Each structure stands twice: as structure tokens, then as C-alpha cells.
């Protein structure tokens, strides 16, 4: 197995997408991108730096001119969740040629993560319902939306660790997930097949699904007791490119959230799936 016979998907701020890059995407034929954007100009640039919003839109315009399909990556938080699901914002993306959108629940990754950006149960429930409304056949938008956290039931829970998906960072470290920065394999040193067989990935696949309630899919965010055990057992090290962080430190920031979300998640799951209760 090699990366040349698989679809590869990159998350990017879009600032390096130019004519040459677009031509290269057309040449290889199996590589596509999602441009990160988190709201309109003021809110987006407040998180991603001045000028990013316009550069992101320019990258979309360029890819559209080359007829390259692309998506967006949207991190939703307690502050922007309604804006990034508003008709006005979605219509802007559609007008730029965007065909799909990844919605990612804010994860408190990093030494200085702001846990106030984590959603309340009511806010997360709104996101669950709104994303399904957006992609509805009736009354929806011409934009296919996927909620990485709330759509677990359609994929059998967590998809990471090489079960369906994994992440490769800029240094070549092959990680279970874009939010889980731990690994013991690098694509520059091993084959892709070898990277998929690293101990941490095997533990991921052995443990999946991490919860029978697929509204609680993650071994970090909703089941924070699990990730530190897997990292310790596998011998994986932190691959955070900014500031290494232990799995214990990361998951400690998720414990209050997990406990708060659990009752709502159980209620929603029982309502939607009475046959599984």
C-alpha cells in the first residue's frame, strides 16, 4: 500500500495555494484540500492572523478557476458556532465554489488551550441538529457538511488510528488523528503500511468503538481516561510541533467537558436509537 493509490487530503490555511500548486494538484489527481476558515473576516482573522480571510477566499477563487474540487475546514467553538452555520456564511462558501465542509468541534490541544471555547451541551446539540439540517435533501444547502464529532453514528464511532483515517503532520509523523499528536512512526523513515502498524494505531483499532454511544466517540474529548493509557502502553511520544504535551495534561482539560456532555449524549442517543439501548 502506498499513498499514490489513496486519496490524500490536506488541511491548509490556503496562503501557499498558487497557480503552480493548482497545476500540480491537477497532475497528481488524488490530492485535494480543505481551506481553514472560522467565520467572517473579523472573527476569522482574530484567530488566524490579519489578512488570512481574504487570502483564504483568494485561494478558493483560484481553485475554482482550475475546476479543482475543494472544501473548507471549520473549527466551531462556543463563540462562533452560530456564525459558521448561518445561511449568510454558507452562501458565501457556496458562491466561492466550495463543495464540502468539515465541521470540527474545538479541541483543547496545546499547552495554552482555552477551555472556555468548548461548547456547552446545548450548543453542541444545536450543532448536531443544524449540520443535519444544512445537508438535508429538503431545505438544505448545496454543500455537503460533515461534523467530525457528531456524525460518529454514521461511521461506527471513532474513525482514527488508521481504521478509516489517520493524519500526517508537516514533519512526517503519522498520527491517529489531526487532534491527537502522538506517534512512533514517520512517513519519511518507514513505508505507509509500516506506519499504519505502529503500536498506538493497533491499540486504537483494538479499542474502537471507544464508546457504544457514538455521540461520545473520542478517546480524548468524551472518554479522556482512554488516550493516556494507549499512549503509555504504545510508547508513543508527543509530536506537537509547537509545544510537546503529555496525554495526561491534554486529557485533564477534557474531563469536566466529558462529564457535562455525557447526560445529554445519553439522552439524545436513547431518543434516536431506542433499539440500541
Feature roles, as predicted:
Residues 6, 68, 98, 135-142, ...:
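Structural alpha-beta junctions
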Residues 16, 39, 107, 181, ...:
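Flexible, active-site-proximal loop/turn residues at the rims of small-molecule/cofactor binding pockets
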Residues 50-53, 121, 125, 185-190:
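Short, conserved loop/turn and helix-capping segments at secondary-structure boundaries
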Residues 179-277:
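Flexible mid-to-C-terminal extensions adjoining Fe-S/redox cofactors in radical SAM and related proteins
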Amino acid at each position: 500500500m502506498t499513498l499514490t493509490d489513496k486519496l490524500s487530503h490536506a488541511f491548509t490555511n490556503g496562503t501557499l495555494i498558487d497557480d503552480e500548486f493548482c497545476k500540480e494538484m491537477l497532475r497528481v489527481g488524488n490530492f485535494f484540500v480543505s481551506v481553514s476558515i472560522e467565520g467572517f473576516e473579523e472573527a476569522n482573522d482574530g484567530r488566524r492572523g490579519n489578512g488570512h480571510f481574504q487570502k483564504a477566499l483568494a485561494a478558493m477563487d483560484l481553485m475554482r478557476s482550475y475546476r479543482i474540487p475543494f472544501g473548507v475546514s471549520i473549527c466551531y467553538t462556543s463563540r462562533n458556532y452560530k456564525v459558521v452555520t448561518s445561511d449568510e456564511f454558507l452562501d458565501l462558501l457556496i458562491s466561492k465554489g466550495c463543495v464540502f465542509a468539515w465541521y470540527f468541534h474545538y479541541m483543547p490541544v496545546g499547552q495554552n488551550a482555552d477551555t472556555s471555547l468548548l461548547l456547552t451541551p446545548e450548543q453542541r446539540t444545536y450543532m448536531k441538529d443544524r449540520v443535519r439540517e444544512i445537508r438535508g435533501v429538503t431545505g438544505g444547502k448545496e454543500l455537503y457538511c460533515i461534523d467530525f464529532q457528531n456524525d460518529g453514528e454514521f461511521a461506527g464511532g471513532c474513525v482514527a488510528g488508521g481504521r478509516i483515517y489517520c493524519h500526517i503532520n508537516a514533519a512526517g509523523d503519522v498520527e491517529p488523528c489531526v487532534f491527537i499528536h502522538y506517534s512512533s512512526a514517520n512517513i519519511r523513515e518507514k513505508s505507509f503500511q509500516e506506519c499504519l502498524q505502529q503500536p498506538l494505531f493497533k491499540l486504537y483499532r483494538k479499542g474502537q468503538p471507544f464508546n457504544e454511544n457514538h455521540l461520545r466517540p473520542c478517546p480524548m474529548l468524551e472518554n479522556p481516561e482512554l488516550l493516556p493509557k494507549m499512549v503509555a502502553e504504545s510508547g508513543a511520544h508527543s509530536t506537537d510541533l509547537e509545544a510537546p504535551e503529555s496525554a495526561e495534561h491534554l486529557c485533564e482539560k477534557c474531563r469536566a467537558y466529558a462529564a457535562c456532555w455525557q447526560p445529554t449524549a445519553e439522552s439524545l442517543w436513547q431518543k434516536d436509537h431506542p433499539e440500541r439501548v
